[in-house]
Amino acid sequence: MAKIVDYGAFADRLKAAPNRWDVLREFHEEWGYAVRPGSDRWDRWTEDEHETYVRALSGEPRDEDGLEGVDLALPIPAALDEWWELPFNSFTHDSQHYETNPVYPPTVRPDPSGYGVAGPLQDDSDLVAPDADRRVCVFMAENQYCNEWGYLAAEAHDPDPRVLVSVDDDRWALQARSVSEFFLQLTVQRLPRTLGWSAEIYDGEEIIDGDEDDLRARITERMPELGFEPWAELQQDTIVYGGPDVLAFVADGELGGIAFAGRTPRAVLDLAERLGVKLTEEDLTEPGEY
Protein backbone atom coordinates (compact mmCIF):
# COMPACT_ATOMS: atom_id res chain seq x y z
CA MET A 1 0.00 0.00 0.00
CA ALA A 2 2.78 2.43 -0.87
CA LYS A 3 0.49 4.74 -2.84
CA ILE A 4 -1.76 6.90 -0.66
CA VAL A 5 -5.41 7.05 -1.69
CA ASP A 6 -7.06 10.35 -0.83
CA TYR A 7 -10.66 9.56 0.03
CA GLY A 8 -11.20 13.26 0.52
CA ALA A 9 -11.45 13.38 -3.28
CA PHE A 10 -13.78 10.38 -3.52
CA ALA A 11 -16.88 12.42 -4.40
CA ASP A 12 -15.07 13.86 -7.44
CA ARG A 13 -13.91 10.36 -8.30
CA LEU A 14 -17.52 9.18 -8.30
CA LYS A 15 -18.59 11.99 -10.61
CA ALA A 16 -15.74 11.30 -13.05
CA ALA A 17 -16.12 7.50 -13.17
CA PRO A 18 -17.77 6.12 -16.33
CA ASN A 19 -19.44 3.41 -14.23
CA ARG A 20 -19.61 2.27 -10.62
CA TRP A 21 -18.17 -1.20 -11.26
CA ASP A 22 -14.75 0.30 -12.02
CA VAL A 23 -14.77 2.17 -8.72
CA LEU A 24 -16.00 -0.93 -6.88
CA ARG A 25 -13.13 -3.02 -8.29
CA GLU A 26 -10.59 -0.35 -7.37
CA PHE A 27 -12.02 -0.05 -3.86
CA HIS A 28 -11.64 -3.80 -3.31
CA GLU A 29 -8.02 -3.58 -4.41
CA GLU A 30 -7.31 -0.53 -2.23
CA TRP A 31 -8.45 -2.36 0.89
CA GLY A 32 -6.53 -5.50 0.09
CA TYR A 33 -9.37 -7.76 -0.98
CA ALA A 34 -8.76 -10.40 -3.62
CA VAL A 35 -10.78 -13.50 -4.38
CA ARG A 36 -8.92 -16.56 -3.14
CA PRO A 37 -8.12 -19.10 -5.87
CA GLY A 38 -10.55 -21.99 -5.70
CA SER A 39 -12.91 -20.27 -3.23
CA ASP A 40 -16.61 -21.09 -3.35
CA ARG A 41 -18.90 -18.63 -5.07
CA TRP A 42 -22.48 -17.80 -4.14
CA ASP A 43 -24.57 -18.11 -7.30
CA ARG A 44 -27.77 -16.11 -7.42
CA TRP A 45 -29.70 -19.31 -8.07
CA THR A 46 -29.22 -23.01 -8.65
CA GLU A 47 -29.74 -24.66 -12.00
CA ASP A 48 -33.12 -25.98 -10.83
CA GLU A 49 -34.20 -22.54 -9.56
CA HIS A 50 -33.27 -20.95 -12.88
CA GLU A 51 -35.16 -23.61 -14.80
CA THR A 52 -38.22 -23.02 -12.62
CA TYR A 53 -38.01 -19.27 -13.26
CA VAL A 54 -37.72 -19.73 -17.02
CA ARG A 55 -40.64 -22.16 -17.05
CA ALA A 56 -42.74 -19.70 -15.05
CA LEU A 57 -41.88 -16.90 -17.48
CA SER A 58 -43.13 -19.07 -20.33
CA GLY A 59 -46.51 -19.38 -18.64
CA GLU A 60 -46.33 -22.95 -17.37
CA PRO A 61 -48.46 -23.71 -14.30
CA ARG A 62 -47.02 -22.36 -11.03
CA ASP A 63 -47.76 -24.81 -8.21
CA GLU A 64 -45.47 -24.30 -5.19
CA ASP A 65 -42.66 -23.21 -7.49
CA GLY A 66 -40.77 -21.18 -4.89
CA LEU A 67 -41.47 -17.88 -6.66
CA GLU A 68 -44.07 -16.53 -4.25
CA GLY A 69 -43.75 -12.77 -4.07
CA VAL A 70 -42.09 -12.49 -7.50
CA ASP A 71 -43.91 -10.48 -10.16
CA LEU A 72 -42.85 -12.19 -13.37
CA ALA A 73 -44.16 -9.26 -15.43
CA LEU A 74 -41.38 -7.04 -14.05
CA PRO A 75 -37.91 -7.30 -15.62
CA ILE A 76 -34.83 -7.64 -13.43
CA PRO A 77 -32.56 -4.61 -13.93
CA ALA A 78 -29.35 -5.36 -15.81
CA ALA A 79 -27.16 -3.85 -13.08
CA LEU A 80 -28.38 -6.39 -10.52
CA ASP A 81 -27.42 -9.34 -12.71
CA GLU A 82 -24.11 -7.66 -13.56
CA TRP A 83 -23.25 -7.37 -9.86
CA TRP A 84 -23.83 -11.07 -9.27
CA GLU A 85 -21.40 -11.90 -12.07
CA LEU A 86 -18.54 -9.54 -11.10
CA PRO A 87 -15.39 -11.69 -10.77
CA PHE A 88 -14.02 -9.56 -7.90
CA ASN A 89 -17.29 -9.49 -5.92
CA SER A 90 -16.45 -9.89 -2.21
CA PHE A 91 -20.09 -10.59 -1.33
CA THR A 92 -20.44 -13.63 -3.55
CA HIS A 93 -17.12 -15.06 -2.29
CA ASP A 94 -17.03 -13.83 1.33
CA SER A 95 -20.56 -12.85 2.32
CA GLN A 96 -19.74 -13.10 6.04
CA HIS A 97 -18.38 -9.54 5.83
CA TYR A 98 -21.79 -8.12 4.95
CA GLU A 99 -24.44 -9.34 7.43
CA THR A 100 -27.12 -9.10 4.76
CA ASN A 101 -29.22 -11.59 2.82
CA PRO A 102 -29.74 -11.36 -0.94
CA VAL A 103 -33.21 -11.81 -2.39
CA TYR A 104 -33.16 -13.23 -5.91
CA PRO A 105 -35.23 -12.97 -7.94
CA PRO A 106 -36.42 -9.80 -6.22
CA THR A 107 -39.77 -9.97 -4.42
CA VAL A 108 -42.31 -7.17 -4.29
CA ARG A 109 -43.51 -5.19 -1.28
CA PRO A 110 -46.17 -5.54 -0.14
CA ASP A 111 -45.26 -9.22 -0.37
CA PRO A 112 -48.27 -11.37 -1.35
CA SER A 113 -46.52 -14.38 0.24
CA GLY A 114 -46.48 -12.62 3.62
CA TYR A 115 -42.74 -13.15 4.13
CA GLY A 116 -41.51 -9.62 3.45
CA VAL A 117 -42.22 -7.20 6.27
CA ALA A 118 -42.31 -3.79 4.55
CA GLY A 119 -45.24 -2.22 2.76
CA PRO A 120 -45.33 -0.26 -0.51
CA LEU A 121 -43.90 3.22 -0.97
CA GLN A 122 -45.86 5.56 1.29
CA ASP A 123 -48.59 7.65 -0.32
CA ASP A 124 -47.01 10.98 0.63
CA SER A 125 -43.66 10.21 -1.04
CA ASP A 126 -42.66 12.32 -4.03
CA LEU A 127 -40.21 9.68 -5.35
CA VAL A 128 -42.77 8.67 -8.00
CA ALA A 129 -45.72 10.30 -9.71
CA PRO A 130 -49.02 10.07 -7.77
CA ASP A 131 -50.48 7.51 -10.19
CA ALA A 132 -47.32 5.35 -10.51
CA ASP A 133 -46.85 1.78 -9.28
CA ARG A 134 -45.79 2.19 -5.63
CA ARG A 135 -44.54 -1.35 -5.07
CA VAL A 136 -40.88 -1.91 -4.21
CA CYS A 137 -38.83 -4.85 -5.53
CA VAL A 138 -36.55 -6.03 -2.71
CA PHE A 139 -33.18 -7.58 -3.62
CA MET A 140 -31.26 -7.30 -0.32
CA ALA A 141 -32.13 -7.34 3.38
CA GLU A 142 -30.37 -6.90 6.69
CA ASN A 143 -29.87 -10.30 8.37
CA GLN A 144 -32.91 -9.91 10.62
CA TYR A 145 -34.91 -8.04 7.96
CA CYS A 146 -34.78 -4.87 10.07
CA ASN A 147 -34.07 -3.07 6.79
CA GLU A 148 -34.78 -4.04 3.20
CA TRP A 149 -33.34 -2.50 0.04
CA GLY A 150 -35.08 -2.47 -3.30
CA TYR A 151 -35.96 -0.52 -6.43
CA LEU A 152 -39.34 0.82 -7.44
CA ALA A 153 -41.48 -1.46 -9.57
CA ALA A 154 -42.19 1.65 -11.64
CA GLU A 155 -38.45 1.80 -12.48
CA ALA A 156 -37.85 -1.93 -13.00
CA HIS A 157 -37.39 -1.37 -16.74
CA ASP A 158 -34.40 0.92 -16.09
CA PRO A 159 -31.03 -0.84 -16.41
CA ASP A 160 -29.73 0.73 -13.17
CA PRO A 161 -32.65 2.14 -11.15
CA ARG A 162 -32.61 4.04 -7.87
CA VAL A 163 -32.52 2.08 -4.61
CA LEU A 164 -34.78 2.67 -1.61
CA VAL A 165 -34.37 1.47 1.98
CA SER A 166 -37.16 0.57 4.39
CA VAL A 167 -36.73 2.78 7.45
CA ASP A 168 -39.71 1.17 9.20
CA ASP A 169 -42.54 -1.15 8.19
CA ASP A 170 -44.45 1.52 6.27
CA ARG A 171 -41.88 4.06 5.11
CA TRP A 172 -39.15 4.04 2.46
CA ALA A 173 -36.32 6.52 1.86
CA LEU A 174 -33.87 7.04 -0.99
CA GLN A 175 -30.66 5.07 -0.35
CA ALA A 176 -28.72 5.27 -3.62
CA ARG A 177 -28.96 6.90 -7.02
CA SER A 178 -28.59 3.51 -8.73
CA VAL A 179 -28.27 -0.22 -8.02
CA SER A 180 -24.58 -0.14 -8.91
CA GLU A 181 -23.98 2.78 -6.55
CA PHE A 182 -25.83 0.93 -3.79
CA PHE A 183 -23.42 -1.99 -4.01
CA LEU A 184 -20.44 0.34 -3.96
CA GLN A 185 -21.93 2.07 -0.92
CA LEU A 186 -22.57 -1.27 0.82
CA THR A 187 -18.95 -2.28 0.25
CA VAL A 188 -17.72 1.04 1.65
CA GLN A 189 -19.79 0.38 4.77
CA ARG A 190 -18.45 -3.14 5.27
CA LEU A 191 -14.94 -3.83 3.96
CA PRO A 192 -12.83 -1.02 5.50
CA ARG A 193 -13.86 -1.85 9.05
CA THR A 194 -13.22 -5.55 8.38
CA LEU A 195 -10.04 -5.47 6.31
CA GLY A 196 -8.55 -2.17 7.52
CA TRP A 197 -7.20 -0.87 10.80
CA SER A 198 -10.10 0.52 12.80
CA ALA A 199 -11.14 2.24 16.01
CA GLU A 200 -14.52 2.90 17.61
CA ILE A 201 -14.73 6.26 19.37
CA TYR A 202 -17.20 6.33 22.26
CA ASP A 203 -18.69 9.42 23.86
CA GLY A 204 -17.48 10.01 27.38
CA GLU A 205 -14.02 8.60 26.77
CA GLU A 206 -11.19 10.82 27.93
CA ILE A 207 -9.38 10.32 24.63
CA ILE A 208 -11.55 12.99 22.93
CA ASP A 209 -10.59 16.65 23.09
CA GLY A 210 -13.98 17.98 24.19
CA ASP A 211 -16.99 15.70 23.71
CA GLU A 212 -18.45 13.68 20.85
CA ASP A 213 -20.37 16.67 19.52
CA ASP A 214 -17.10 18.59 19.27
CA LEU A 215 -15.53 15.68 17.41
CA ARG A 216 -18.47 15.45 15.00
CA ALA A 217 -18.14 19.16 14.29
CA ARG A 218 -14.41 18.84 13.55
CA ILE A 219 -15.01 15.91 11.20
CA THR A 220 -17.72 17.83 9.34
CA GLU A 221 -15.54 20.92 9.02
CA ARG A 222 -12.28 19.23 8.04
CA MET A 223 -13.22 16.12 6.03
CA PRO A 224 -15.24 15.95 2.78
CA GLU A 225 -18.12 13.51 2.44
CA LEU A 226 -17.68 10.60 0.03
CA GLY A 227 -20.70 11.74 -1.98
CA PHE A 228 -23.30 9.10 -1.10
CA GLU A 229 -26.75 9.38 0.39
CA PRO A 230 -26.64 8.76 4.18
CA TRP A 231 -26.51 5.02 4.86
CA ALA A 232 -29.74 4.04 6.67
CA GLU A 233 -29.55 0.82 8.69
CA LEU A 234 -30.61 -0.31 12.17
CA GLN A 235 -32.11 3.08 13.05
CA GLN A 236 -28.91 4.92 12.19
CA ASP A 237 -28.01 7.31 9.38
CA THR A 238 -24.29 7.08 8.66
CA ILE A 239 -22.29 9.59 6.63
CA VAL A 240 -18.77 8.61 5.55
CA TYR A 241 -16.01 11.22 5.35
CA GLY A 242 -12.66 10.74 3.63
CA GLY A 243 -9.01 11.60 4.12
CA PRO A 244 -5.61 10.22 3.07
CA ASP A 245 -5.93 6.41 3.30
CA VAL A 246 -8.66 6.77 5.92
CA LEU A 247 -12.43 6.98 6.40
CA ALA A 248 -14.53 8.36 9.25
CA PHE A 249 -18.00 6.87 9.80
CA VAL A 250 -20.35 9.21 11.65
CA ALA A 251 -23.74 7.77 12.60
CA ASP A 252 -26.63 9.51 14.30
CA GLY A 253 -29.65 7.98 15.99
CA GLU A 254 -29.95 6.19 19.33
CA LEU A 255 -27.26 3.67 18.35
CA GLY A 256 -25.08 6.22 16.59
CA GLY A 257 -21.36 6.66 17.04
CA ILE A 258 -18.06 7.42 15.34
CA ALA A 259 -15.55 5.00 13.84
CA PHE A 260 -12.29 5.38 11.93
CA ALA A 261 -10.97 2.87 9.39
CA GLY A 262 -7.64 3.15 7.61
CA ARG A 263 -5.61 1.25 5.08
CA THR A 264 -2.66 1.55 7.46
CA PRO A 265 -2.41 2.12 11.23
CA ARG A 266 -0.50 5.33 10.54
CA ALA A 267 -3.43 6.72 8.56
CA VAL A 268 -5.80 6.19 11.50
CA LEU A 269 -3.37 7.62 14.04
CA ASP A 270 -2.68 10.68 11.88
CA LEU A 271 -6.41 11.31 11.48
CA ALA A 272 -6.97 10.93 15.21
CA GLU A 273 -4.23 13.48 15.93
CA ARG A 274 -5.71 15.96 13.45
CA LEU A 275 -9.14 15.61 15.05
CA GLY A 276 -8.07 15.80 18.68
CA VAL A 277 -8.44 12.10 19.56
CA LYS A 278 -5.74 10.37 21.59
CA LEU A 279 -5.08 6.94 20.08
CA THR A 280 -2.10 4.58 19.97
CA GLU A 281 -1.61 1.59 17.70
CA GLU A 282 -2.54 -0.66 20.65
CA ASP A 283 -6.00 0.94 20.60
CA LEU A 284 -6.65 -0.14 17.00
CA THR A 285 -8.39 -3.29 15.82
CA GLU A 286 -6.17 -5.12 13.35
CA PRO A 287 -7.45 -6.21 9.93
CA GLY A 288 -9.44 -9.42 10.00
CA GLU A 289 -8.81 -12.50 7.90
CA TYR A 290 -11.06 -13.79 5.17
Segments and roles (model prediction):
Residues 1-158, 193-202, 220, 225, ...:
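A surface-exposed partner-binding patch
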